[in-house]
């Protein structure tokens, strides 16, 4: 197979020359690689674990996007684990969010009179677009306010093990500080596989903990 080999002075123009940038590019283009000439070789020794898609109908997504873009209210049919029977909700959505495992929409809920997350795969029927809403993204305090999440190695690990964990997660001074919107704190913890309710009995399995968990508890309520 013909191709180009970079010389030592060669510098990439569209990404930086870090390993993380290249690996991120591999991840982003994994699904397209078999269909694009020239990418197949780069991906021949790469395997990305994909999360199965949750079924979301276009008839649900289209009005959601329109409501987000135009600041409109939306009438939806929704089910949840607490309310398994279909319930009519009036919401004012403003942002679609992918947590790494599922899609949800951040929206003002007129029933509960607060901003909440609605899982897209739990919407039923066809949403109806209504009039403009006064409850916009600008009024969603938990969305517009960021807090630091401080990860540290599990203190039950010995010094050598903690040093390995610090390197694994790119920690500085023994901690990794991740800034997050308040509304997304619980999803960030899930991405780092930290369950704030249950600590693993094996510190080698736990690996990292959140040192400022008390300050974050107001935003750890689960749906």
Segments (PLM) and residue ranges:
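Basic, Lys/Arg-rich alpha-helical nucleic-acid-recognition elements, primarily the DNA-binding modules
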Residues: 1
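Short, solvent-exposed polar/charged micro-motifs at secondary-structure junctions
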Residues: 6-9, 84-89, 211-220
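Bulky hydrophobic/aromatic content
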Residues: 6-79, 191, 198-202, 209
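Short, charged low-complexity intrinsically disordered segments located at boundaries
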Residues: 12-20, 54-56, 93-98, 214-223
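Short N-terminal signal/transit or membrane-insertion segments
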Residues: 24-45, 97-105, 157-159, 171-172, ...
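Core beta-strand-centered patch of the WYL/Sm-like small regulatory domain
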Residues: 43-160, 164-166
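Polybasic (Lys/Arg-rich)
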Residues: 144-223
């Amino acid at each position: 197979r013909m191709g180009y080999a970079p010389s030592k002075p060669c510098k990439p123009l569209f990404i930086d020359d870090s390993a993380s940038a290249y690996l991120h590019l591999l991840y982003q283009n994994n699904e397209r690689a078999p269909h694009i000439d020239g990418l197949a070789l780069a991906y021949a020794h790469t395997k990305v674990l994909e999360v199965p898609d949750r079924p979301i109908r276009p008839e649900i997504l289209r009005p959601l996007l329109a409501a987000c873009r135009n600041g409109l209210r939306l009438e939806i049919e929704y089910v949840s684990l607490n309310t398994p029977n279909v319930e009519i909700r009036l919401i004012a959505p403003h942002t679609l969010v992918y947590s790494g495992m599922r899609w949800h929409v951040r929206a003002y809920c007129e029933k509960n009179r607060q901003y909440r997350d609605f899982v897209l795969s739990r919407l039923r029927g066809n949403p109806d677009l209504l009039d403009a809403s006064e409850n916009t993204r600008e009024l969603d305090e938990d969305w517009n306010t960021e807090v630091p999440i401080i990860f540290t190695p599990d203190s039950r690990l010995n010094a050598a093990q903690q040093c390995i964990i610090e390197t694994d997660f790119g920690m500085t001074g023994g901690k990794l500080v991740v800034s997050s919107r308040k509304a997304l704190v619980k999803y960030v913890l899930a991405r780092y596989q930290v369950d704030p309710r249950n600590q693993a009995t094996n510190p080698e399995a736990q690996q990292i903990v959140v040192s400022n968990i008390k300050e974050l508890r107001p935003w750890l309520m689960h749906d």
